[in-house]
Amino acid sequence: MALEKSLALLPLLVLVLLVLGWVQPSLGRESRAKKFQRQHMDSDGSPSSNPTYCNDMMRRRNMTQGRCKPVNTFVHEPLVDVQDVCFQEKVTCKNGQANCYKSSSSMHITDCRLTNGSRYPNCAYRTSQKERHIIVACEGNPYVPVHFDASVEDST
């Protein structure tokens, strides 16, 4: 009798475990907006002439774990100014999607590019400071940047 009750509850237990296994990983997952901030925002600082800025930041922001991210851009502007780009000039993203926006003014950025011959785990980057318009993909509610698409020179 007790065995029959246990067997009757087994499918319910399996279902609960499956649901928990599906829901639980998403609870700790970084949102696309938070990932954008981690990978691209550095409002507090500017590398000045620090040649190791990219090496330090790429490592500190977890972009050299398991592989060397080939290219990354850090934006040295207040987060609210970068978020405002989502309500500026609409442009087509590199991948053809229609949710990209170009900043109306140029912004202080640092381009980090993997140097030739650099291999994981010894990721080495070239640091280049620039003043460029940025193009970001935006989504969500609130509508915020979730992807850094490009930087472009002032077209005037």
From Swiss-Prot:
<feature type="binding site">
    <location>
        <position position="38"/>
    </location>
    <ligand>
        <name>substrate</name>
    </ligand>
</feature>
<comment type="function">
    <text>Endonuclease that catalyzes the cleavage of RNA on the 3' side of pyrimidine nucleotides. Acts on single-stranded and double-stranded RNA.</text>
</comment>
<comment type="subunit">
    <text>Monomer. Interacts with and forms tight 1:1 complexes with RNH1. Dimerization of two such complexes may occur. Interaction with RNH1 inhibits this protein.</text>
</comment>
<dbReference type="InterPro" id="IPR023411">
    <property type="entry name" value="RNaseA_AS"/>
</dbReference>
<dbReference type="GO" id="GO:0016829">
    <property type="term" value="F:lyase activity"/>
</dbReference>
<feature type="signal peptide">
    <location>
        <begin position="1"/>
        <end position="28"/>
    </location>
</feature>
<feature type="region of interest" description="Disordered">
    <location>
        <begin position="33"/>
        <end position="52"/>
    </location>
</feature>
<feature type="binding site">
    <location>
        <position position="35"/>
    </location>
    <ligand>
        <name>substrate</name>
    </ligand>
</feature>
<feature type="disulfide bond">
    <location>
        <begin position="68"/>
        <end position="123"/>
    </location>
</feature>
<keyword id="KW-1015">Disulfide bond</keyword>
<feature type="compositionally biased region" description="Basic and acidic residues">
    <location>
        <begin position="33"/>
        <end position="43"/>
    </location>
</feature>
<protein>
    <recommendedName>
        <fullName>Ribonuclease pancreatic</fullName>
        <ecNumber>4.6.1.18</ecNumber>
    </recommendedName>
</protein>
<dbReference type="InterPro" id="IPR023412">
    <property type="entry name" value="RNaseA_domain"/>
</dbReference>
<feature type="active site" description="Proton acceptor">
    <location>
        <position position="40"/>
    </location>
</feature>
<dbReference type="GO" id="GO:0004522">
    <property type="term" value="F:ribonuclease A activity"/>
</dbReference>
<keyword id="KW-0540">Nuclease</keyword>
<keyword id="KW-0964">Secreted</keyword>
<keyword id="KW-0732">Signal</keyword>
<feature type="glycosylation site" description="N-linked (GlcNAc...) asparagine">
    <location>
        <position position="62"/>
    </location>
</feature>
<dbReference type="InterPro" id="IPR036816">
    <property type="entry name" value="RNaseA-like_dom_sf"/>
</dbReference>
<dbReference type="GO" id="GO:0003676">
    <property type="term" value="F:nucleic acid binding"/>
</dbReference>
<dbReference type="GO" id="GO:0005576">
    <property type="term" value="C:extracellular region"/>
</dbReference>
<feature type="binding site">
    <location>
        <position position="94"/>
    </location>
    <ligand>
        <name>substrate</name>
    </ligand>
</feature>
<keyword id="KW-0255">Endonuclease</keyword>
<dbReference type="GO" id="GO:0050830">
    <property type="term" value="P:defense response to Gram-positive bacterium"/>
</dbReference>
<feature type="disulfide bond">
    <location>
        <begin position="54"/>
        <end position="112"/>
    </location>
</feature>
<feature type="binding site">
    <location>
        <position position="113"/>
    </location>
    <ligand>
        <name>substrate</name>
    </ligand>
</feature>
<dbReference type="InterPro" id="IPR001427">
    <property type="entry name" value="RNaseA"/>
</dbReference>
<feature type="disulfide bond">
    <location>
        <begin position="93"/>
        <end position="100"/>
    </location>
</feature>
<feature type="binding site">
    <location>
        <begin position="69"/>
        <end position="73"/>
    </location>
    <ligand>
        <name>substrate</name>
    </ligand>
</feature>
<dbReference type="Pfam" id="PF00074">
    <property type="entry name" value="RnaseA"/>
</dbReference>
<feature type="disulfide bond">
    <location>
        <begin position="86"/>
        <end position="138"/>
    </location>
</feature>
<keyword id="KW-0378">Hydrolase</keyword>
<comment type="similarity">
    <text>Belongs to the pancreatic ribonuclease family.</text>
</comment>
<feature type="active site" description="Proton donor">
    <location>
        <position position="147"/>
    </location>
</feature>
<keyword id="KW-0456">Lyase</keyword>
<feature type="glycosylation site" description="N-linked (GlcNAc...) asparagine">
    <location>
        <position position="116"/>
    </location>
</feature>
<keyword id="KW-0325">Glycoprotein</keyword>
